[in-house]
């Protein structure tokens, strides 16, 4: 087995590393840099990747693609895609399959393709350094990436000519690099604020075992959003001073974006900076220049709410892991945005301790991916990585209830089966609808996909045994199967990347689950009450058909009256009324039970009398002497 490289496929920058002996090493690219801008440009029928693409962005904004990681695995109608359309100079278009693609140089590209071009650059960088062909890689993704986004990332690797041995979560990779060859046992938090995404993971590290206890995050929050705030501020100030709106000028926007990013970085180490952009635009009076003094205090005011948005996922991750802030022994900072003093201050305030700054936030994820690659090709031993799935997975059951098969923060790989049945008599097929989320009703969660299991032999409802199995592999990709135990018929499906979950939807699912917990509980209780009542109606009608003639007309009338009342109550949404009528029918059913018992007792008594009353026949016989 050859070398397995580790790639941090970032929103803003990417990085590649490999195990060299017993240590992971970041590999410099052809430009002599340890990280490569995640930017692709198409100019004069040529494709540029990384720094060369970034350098020409100002003069070629419409054909320069950046931050495509925000689009990967997303549907064109996703609110986050719509938001992104107003932030980038290139065109985001709707693909035939409904996904969000990009358009450049009169061609349409999927985000997986654009990502593949970046991965190819990483692959070439590694091959130039190692002097051998590289075909296998471990690629990192945000911990909160959903199934569609993970598959799309894996597809990007395949397009780039790489066999993706493992998709690994970025905070987990960072923890691997942080805890590699350290013997101490610790509970740590990894706070990862990168160019486009935010993740937080809580891990326990002990004797080479890296166990993720919980994870949370926001897949549409990162440095790009900070840059946009600065950019909008510059547009506003310039408009106030000159009366000219730069927001419709692609060339000016690209220059402003670069200036915003540069100012943001400078203000991490200084309290004030000058933003000078000569000849930013022109009008009838001549050329216009932008010259603005920008302070750290102004920046912090602009982005304060963005920083605050990272704290709630931290709080939720701790809650899910069963920890308090003072249980965390180390907070590891990952991602370029964690260099910002205000971010470090917010982390310190929440966790009550100084964050650990002993790792390079731009490189630590790639180093961790390389270590995982070393584990997979046996270069590294004595390391066990236990990661988790970020959201609950389940199916829709009778009444629209979301029945969980795998809870969020379950260790992966994981496999879970549960037996379900049919809702109607002689039902020959069932539709399995797979959802992801935290709400009690399926419709409030995200539909990942659906499939049919057909050919179920005719049987009364509740009799067929349909085993539904969820299987999440080590990459976090979901496989679902349904099998009729009687006929052996089986249907399997891998949830396909046909849109995936948006960051807003994922975040909203958890928040809605908390804010609407009471409402969800009541709704679930109503559904369960109705299901129980419906089953009682069904069994009562069946019993009446079989034993109704054993009841007196008065007893039968009482049961039928209670049955009619419960049916009427089932038409309402009143759980207490349904419970009351269910109780009445249950009591009335006692009469049927008594009649059945009486009939059975009489039959047994009759059989016993028949045996006792049988006549004994005396037989005459002769005793014949032996001769």
From Swiss-Prot:
SUPFAM superfamilies: Actin-like ATPase domain, Heat shock protein 70kD (HSP70), C-terminal subdomain, Heat shock protein 70kD (HSP70), peptide-binding domain
Annotated signal sequence range: none
Keyword Chloroplast: no
Pfam families: HSP70 (PF00012)
Induction per the UniProt record: By stress conditions e.g. heat shock.
Domain of life: Bacteria
Modified residues annotated as Phosphothreonine in this record: 197
Annotated GO MF terms: ATP binding; ATP-dependent protein folding chaperone; unfolded protein binding
PROSITE patterns hit by this protein: HSP70_1 (PS00297), HSP70_2 (PS00329), HSP70_3 (PS01036)
Keywords, sorted A to Z: ATP-binding, Chaperone, Nucleotide-binding, Phosphoprotein, Stress response
Family: Belongs to the heat shock protein 70 family.
Functional note: Acts as a chaperone.
Protein name, as recorded: Chaperone protein DnaK
Lineage, opening ranks: Bacteria, Pseudomonadati, Pseudomonadota, Alphaproteobacteria, Rickettsiales
């Amino acid at each position: 087995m050859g070398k397995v490289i580790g790639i941090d496929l970032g929103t803003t920058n990417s990085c590649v590393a490999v195990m060299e002996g017993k240590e992971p090493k970041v590999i410099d690219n052809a430009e002599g840099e340890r990280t490569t801008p995640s930017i692709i440009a198409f100019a004069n029928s040529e494709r540029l990747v990384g720094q060369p693409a970034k350098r020409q962005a100002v003069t070629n904004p419409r054909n320069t693609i950046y931050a495509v990681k925000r689009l990967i695995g997303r549907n064109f109608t996703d609110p986050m895609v719509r938001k992104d359309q107003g932030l980038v100079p290139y065109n985001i278009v709707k693909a035939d399959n409904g996904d969000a693609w990009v358009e450049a140089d009169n061609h349409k590209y999927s985000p997986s393709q654009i990502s593949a071009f970046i991965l190819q650059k990483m692959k070439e960088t590694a091959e130039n350094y190692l002097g051998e062909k590289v075909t296998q890689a471990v690629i990192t993704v945000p911990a909160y990436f959903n199934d569609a986004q993970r598959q799309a990332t894996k597809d990007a690797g395949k397009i780039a000519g790489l066999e993706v041995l493992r998709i690994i979560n970025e905070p987990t990779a960072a923890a691997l690099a942080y805890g590699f060859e350290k013997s101490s046992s610790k509970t740590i938090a990894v706070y990862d604020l990168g160019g486009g995404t935010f993740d937080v993971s809580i891990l326990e590290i002990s004797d080479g075992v890296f166990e993720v206890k919980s994870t949370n995050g926001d897949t549409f929050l990162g440095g790009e959003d900070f840059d946009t705030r600065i950019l909008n501020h510059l547009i506003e100030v310039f408009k106030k001073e000159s009366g000219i709106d730069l927001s419709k000028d692609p060339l000016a926007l690209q220059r402003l974006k670069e200036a915003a990013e540069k100012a943001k970085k400078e203000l991490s180490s200084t309290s004030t900076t000058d933003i000078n952009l000569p000849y930013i635009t022109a009008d009838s009076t001549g050329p216009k220049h932008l010259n603005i003094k920008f302070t750290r205090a102004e920046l912090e005011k602009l982005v304060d709410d963005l920083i605050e948005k990272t704290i709630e996922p931290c709080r939720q991750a701790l809650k899910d892991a069963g920890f308090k802030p003072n249980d965390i022994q180390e907070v590891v900072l990952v991602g370029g945005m964690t260099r910002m003093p205000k971010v470090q201050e917010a982390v310190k305030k929440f966790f009550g301790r100084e964050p650990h700054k002993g790792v390079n936030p731009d490189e630590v994820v790639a180093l961790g991916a390389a270590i995982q690659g070393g584990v997979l090709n046996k270069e590294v031993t004595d390391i066990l990585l236990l990661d988790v799935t970020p959201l609950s997975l389940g199916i829709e059951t009778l009444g629209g209830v979301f029945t969980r098969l795998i809870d969020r923060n379950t260790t992966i790989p994981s496999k879970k089966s549960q037996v379900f049945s049919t809702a109607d008599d002689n039902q020959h097929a069932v539709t399995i609808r797979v959802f992801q989320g935290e709400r009690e009703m399926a419709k409030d969660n995200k539909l990942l996909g659906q499939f049919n299991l057909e050919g179920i032999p005719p049987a009364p409802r509740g009799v067929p045994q349909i085993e539904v199995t969820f299987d999440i592999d080590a990459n976090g990709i979901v496989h679902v199967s349904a099998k009729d135990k009687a006929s052996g018929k089986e249907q399997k499906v891998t949830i396909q990347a046909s849109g995936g979950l948006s960051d807003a939807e994922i975040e909203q699912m958890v928040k809605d689950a908390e804010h609407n917990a009471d409402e969800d509980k009541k709704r679930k209780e109503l559904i369960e009450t109705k299901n129980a009542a419906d089953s009682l109606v069904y069994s009562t009608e069946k019993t009446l058909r079989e034993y109704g003639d054993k009841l007196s007309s008065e007893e039968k009338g009482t049961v039928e009256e209670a049955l009619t009342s419960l049916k009427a109550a089932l038409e309402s949404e009143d759980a207490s009324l349904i419970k009351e009528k269910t109780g009445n029918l249950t009591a009335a059913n006692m009469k049927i039970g008594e009649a059945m018992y009486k009939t059975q007792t009489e039959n047994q008594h009759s059989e016993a009398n028949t045996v006792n009353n049988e006549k004994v026949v005396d037989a005459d016989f002769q005793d014949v002497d032996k001769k």
